[in-house]
Amino acid sequence: LVSSGATIIARTHAAQVKHMNEMFERAILHPGFAVVETLSECTMFNPGSFDDSIPRKGGVFDLVNEEEQDLESVAAAMDLSQDLTPGKFGVYYETKRPTKNELEREWLTDARSKIGDLSERDLLRQRFASMR
């Protein structure tokens, strides 16, 4: 997911509604490409498969300690993601980088300074015409 440009990656569980809402809210408010993996057991084929992570069933909902975890480290995020039993929950990776919209605005501003005050549509038409 990092190679696809994700700037925040988190894992939550459907049985932990408060945590799930926190992760969704954090992802929505994060500027950039956000991914929240939401685990949910299939009661038909794998009943009880996530009992180890549900406190009301005797399990432990193990959270990522963001104070100790280097959230900007791709290697640390990969290490967390390798534990499939069901692993830790929370934010695995978070970084700041320019968003697509910010880069596009920068490109448009730069293009306008070179070409003149054209509309965004006219700038794109001119750019595509130059590629022919």
Task: Map each language-model feature to its residues.
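Conserved thiamine diphosphate
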Residues: 1-26
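Short, conserved beta-strand edge motifs with alternating hydrophobic and charged residues
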Residues: 9-12, 35-39
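Hydrophobic pocket-lining "lid/loop/helix" segments that shape and contact the acyl-thioester
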Residues: 21-22, 30, 41
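Short, structured secondary-structure boundary patches
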Residues: 29-34, 56-59
